[in-house]
Regions:
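Single-stranded RNA-binding regions, centering on S1/OB-family and related RNA-binding modules
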Residues: 1-294
Length: 294
């Protein structure tokens, strides 16, 4: 018999924690805490999936996982081993399966991390070992459905299922196909990563373009808040930066571009939270307002 098969077997023995079933002279253990309170009698037949658990015991599981040979589903990463690959919880009792490093991106910064999810199935090799097999595009495309036009500029939750040179393919939690171009990432994407993203385009076929970058007003708010906090902590509540400052000086001082700096300053001037002395710098003029931004 091959592990991963669903068999019908007869109960031949039990102890305090397990039932034991036999099929063709081979014995499999069934954990009693996995039977949903069901009690079985000797000679009664049960049906379940057989495999070897992490303690190297042949076992049978009667609550079939969604992910099994020929069936795909979402599995959760439980451990990352750079010398082996990633371990995935697919719903088997006392067993995770491995997705080999050979099936993962060459760049380990793109590997899934703990709690990320992969859409996959099980492959059983000639030594009766389970391996996770990541779904190809054609398989995951069976989940797709067209997105409505009203999603334009809305936020969606999506998961990366494929990485490409130009960006990443994702599927939203509703089943919409999405793409994020490499220019729209803030950090390098990971296979299996869940992201919150903004819809920048809804195509006629119902697929989406997404961006992980903040909206312009959100970016301004973040940069403005940073400036206020720096001014609050600086001697005399002053920063020696202005619209004539060298872009590299601004970048090294604040970590943002000169364009971002000018937009943030403009926003704070409009709100009367700072004043600007020409070619000298910025002063905080209303510390009471600062508490509202924290």
């Amino acid at each position: 018999m091959q592990y991963g098969e669903i068999i019908t077997a007869k109960i031949t023995d039990e102890n305090a924690t397990h039932y034991f079933v036999q099929k063709n002279g081979q014995t499999f253990a069934l954990a009693k805490d996995q039977t949903d309170g069901e009690h079985y009698q000797l000679e009664e037949e049960i049906e379940g999936l057989i495999y070897e658990d992490m303690d190297h015991r042949p076992v049978i599981q009667i609550n079939l996982p969604d992910i099994r040979p020929g069936f795909f589903g979402w599995g959760t990463i439980t451990q990352v081993r750079k010398d082996l690959g990633v371990f995935v919880d697919i719903g088997l009792y006392n067993k995770d399966i491995v997705v080999s490093l050979d099936d993962l991106p060459d760049d380990r910064s793109h590997w899934p991390q703990k709690a990320d999810c992969l859409y996959l199935t099980i492959m059983v090799d000639q030594k009766n070992r389970f391996w996770g097999q990541i779904a190809n595009y054609e398989e995951i495309a069976k989940l797709f459905k067209p997105a409505p036009q009203r999603l334009m500029n809305q936020d969606v939750e999506a998961r990366i299922f494929q990485l490409k040179l130009a960006g990443a393919q994702l599927i939203t939690k509703e089943g919409y196909r999405a793409f994020v171009h490499e220019s729209e990432w803030i950090l390098p994407p990971r296979l299996g990563q869940k992201v919150q993203a903004r819809v920048t385009k809804v195509h006629p076929d119902g697929s989406l373009n997404l961006s992980l970058k903040p909206r312009a007003h959100e970016a301004i708010e973040d940069d403005a808040t940073m400036l206020l906090r720096l001014l609050d902590k600086s001697p005399n509540h002053f920063l020696p930066l202005h619209d004539k400052s060298d872009p590299e000086v601004i970048k090294s001082y604040l970590g943002i571009s000169k364009g971002q700096f000018k937009r943030a300053v403009g926003s704070l001037l409009k709100d009367k939270k700072i004043r600007q002395e020409k070619e000298k710098g910025l002063y905080l003029i209303d510390k009471d307002d600062l508490s509202e931004t924290r």
